[in-house]
């Protein structure tokens, strides 16, 4: 039964207990089902700690060698067979320590000298998040590369730009894709900033107050690739800012991926028809044989909500905790692990979609031409050529749009006679600005949609990414 009381207590901490925990206590207390993912970081941290203990003559070189060989054997076992889930041992630290004792005997107990699970798990978790950031950055770099390559192909491809999902002004597809390149650049910057902040080692902070042993925290920090040890032992074991930083950066990235996914979904719908989805990232319907559903994009959009939920989960866990370690903090890892898995998959899916989408320039151009998207160009022409205030030009242009709409024609299809009837200051030269190509080419300010500007930004991006 789940409420059956166990008579054995945990050998690692049970000396002051007269009886063991109930089965339900073992279940709620065990983190090994998820923190086994930390095994590589846990062994790396233990090796760094061990070498420091030996160098400071806190344990003998003979015991140190036994422990090191035991840790190597355990790492090989985990790599081959996975980490055993012994709930009675609670977590990855105790599972590894028990296995080490089985292999080398009592010398295993010396490894935990001058160390607590509090600083141990903080160290492991920081190392894991640091590795996760590096993996995400690699994925985001691949996505940026795909965006840049496709943007270069379509630097001059005209499409409608939208506000409120209403046709606004003509832009280029390359310009649109490069907007997402910029978003992902900020995402990478946020992850990079978080990596810099986390890169201080909590190892040696012990339970919360430091240790009376003559340890060298700078040595272990350097061995593990940290910039320095943390400066306050209490903060060291209390801190999960690095996990929250990761989740907040992941959430912002997921928002950007979701927006791109939403646009792909819209563009692939029949009323738009701007893109054709690749079979590899689409699914069909069980009842409607004609369907090609944008499921990969929809799942990226869906995953973004779950990632935001992971962030909120850890925020709620941490918001009311007193300093040092509380068992609530055992729940810090599942949301980070889940968010990382979801984000990594979303990035890979989006990269694959961008690489293989078929864009349909003819439909994009036709839609841009049909939506009065050059109305602003007419207003700008009136300001420049007729010298009238923009608000008056705006009103005149609105009248021209209304007339074209009544006639069922595009704005540039209005005759000069039609335009002069609206305002006699309009002359033949206005025709030069009313085509979508002229409109796009005129937006040549820095960062604008003119093909020359788009190509310049692509060149900058290729240099940043190290592309030839």
Curated annotation (Swiss-Prot):
One of its GO terms (biological process) is L-arginine biosynthetic process. Its EC number is 4.3.2.1. It is found in: Cytoplasm. Transmembrane segments: none annotated. GO terms for cellular component: cytosol. One of its GO terms (molecular function) is argininosuccinate lyase activity. It catalyses: 2-(N(omega)-L-arginino)succinate = fumarate + L-arginine. Keywords: Amino-acid biosynthesis, Arginine biosynthesis, Cytoplasm, Lyase. Pathway: Amino-acid biosynthesis; L-arginine biosynthesis; L-arginine from L-ornithine and carbamoyl phosphate: step 3/3. HAMAP family: Arg_succ_lyase. Belongs to the lyase 1 family. Argininosuccinate lyase subfamily. This is Argininosuccinate lyase. It comes from Zymomonas mobilis subsp. mobilis (strain ATCC 31821 / ZM4 / CP4).
């Amino acid at each position: 039964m789940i409420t059956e009381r166990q008579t054995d207590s945990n050998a690692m901490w049970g000396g002051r207990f007269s009886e063991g925990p109930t089965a339900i206590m073992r279940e709620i207390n065990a983190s090994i089902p998820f923190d086994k993912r930390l095994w590589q970081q846990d062994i790396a941290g233990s090796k760094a700690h061990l070498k420091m203990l030996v160098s400071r003559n806190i344990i003998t070189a003979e015991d140190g060698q036994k422990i090191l060989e035991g840790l190597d054997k355990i790492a090989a076992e985990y790599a081959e067979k996975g980490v055993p889930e012994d709930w009675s041992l609670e977590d990855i630290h105790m599972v590894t320590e028990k296995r080490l004792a089985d292999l080398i005997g009592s010398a295993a107990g010396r490894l935990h000298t001058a160390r607590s699970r509090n600083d141990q798990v903080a160290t492991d978790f920081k190392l894991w998040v640091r590795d996760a950031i590096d993996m995400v950055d690699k994925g985001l770099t691949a996505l940026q590369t795909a965006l840049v390559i496709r943007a270069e192909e379509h630097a001059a491809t005209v499409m409608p730009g939208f506000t409120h999902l209403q046709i606004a002004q003509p832009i280029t597809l390359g310009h649109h894709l490069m907007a997402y390149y910029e978003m992902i650049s900020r995402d990478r910057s946020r992850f990079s900033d978080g990596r810099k902040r986390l890169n201080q080692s909590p190892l040696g902070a012990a339970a919360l107050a430091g240790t009376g042993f003559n340890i060298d925290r700078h040595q272990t920090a350097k061995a593990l690739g940290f910039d320095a040890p943390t400066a306050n032992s209490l903060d060291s074991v209390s801190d999960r800012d690095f996990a929250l930083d990761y989740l907040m950066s992941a959430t912002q990235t997921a928002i950007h991926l979701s927006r791109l996914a939403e646009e792909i979904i819209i563009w692939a719908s029949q009323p738009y028809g701007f893109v054709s989805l690749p079979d590899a990232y689409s699914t069909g319907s069980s009842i409607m044989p004609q369907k090609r559903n944008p499921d990969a994009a929809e799942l990226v959009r869906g995953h973004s909500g779950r990632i935001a939920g992971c962030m909120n989960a850890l925020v709620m866990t941490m918001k009311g905790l007193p300093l040092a370690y509380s068992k609530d903090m055992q729940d810090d890892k599942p949301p980070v692990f889940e968010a990382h898995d979801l984000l990594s998959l979303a990035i890979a899916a989006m990269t694959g979609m961008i690489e293989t989408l078929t864009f349909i320039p003819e439909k994009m151009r036709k839609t841009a031409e049909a939506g009065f998207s050059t109305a602003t160009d007419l207003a700008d022409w009136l300001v420049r050529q007729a010298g009238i205030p923009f608000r008056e030009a705006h009103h005149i242009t609105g009248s021209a749009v209304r007339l074209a709409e009544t006639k069922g024609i595009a704005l540039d299809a209005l005759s000069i006679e039609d335009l002069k009837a609206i305002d006699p200051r309009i002359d033949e030269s206005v025709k030069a600005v009313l085509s979508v190509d002229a409109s796009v080419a005129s937006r040549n300010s820095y960062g604008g949609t003119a093909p020359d500007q788009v190509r310049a930004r692509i060149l900058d991006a290729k240099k940043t990414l190290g592309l030839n």
